[in-house]
Amino acid sequence: KIYDHDAYDMDKNVYLGTTRRGTPVYLDKRAVEADKVILTGGITPHLFAGFGGGRKSVLPGIAAAETINHNHVMALSDTIGGGINPDTCLAKTWDNRVSDDMCDATALLNPCFLVNAIMDADGDFYAVAAGHWYEAWLEGTRIVTKQQGVKAKAKADIAISSGGGFPRDMNLYQGMKAYVPAAMALKEGGVI
């Protein structure tokens, strides 16, 4: 059987505990009660969680809205009006409180296995990460970094960037996926 997770029906989600950052973890009751949980998906760079895949199958994947909201607000600065927290950024898995919180929530469920695809620019399989839910995912992030990362000799004064057109730039959030990497390549005061 295939089920759609309902993040808003608290009768279908159960409390497992709290993360180190105070996020109350409510997950889909069916997953919590399952004999085995296998995480599936794909690993891609992610604006705030560093990379997609792995623990994101649990949070936000099968988490209640309260859990998701508590986690996602960590992408913002602690200062009102401060914008995005610079430690929650693209391709960063260490000291990234959004990602760390997702890992804490996933550890409470403790999935038995992970299978995540890594795709190439044409949408074909490039590699598969499989094994322990954290270790295999982390190795997959290294593969994605080698496959998609670009080393710059120096920061630039100007960067030209494009999301690639619709649907990759259909709203501000999607458009940021082109803006953020360009901003990472700029000198202080540089122009996109």
Locations of regions flagged by a protein language model:
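Short, acidic/small-residue loops that bind anionic groups at enzyme active sites
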Residues: 2-4, 59-75
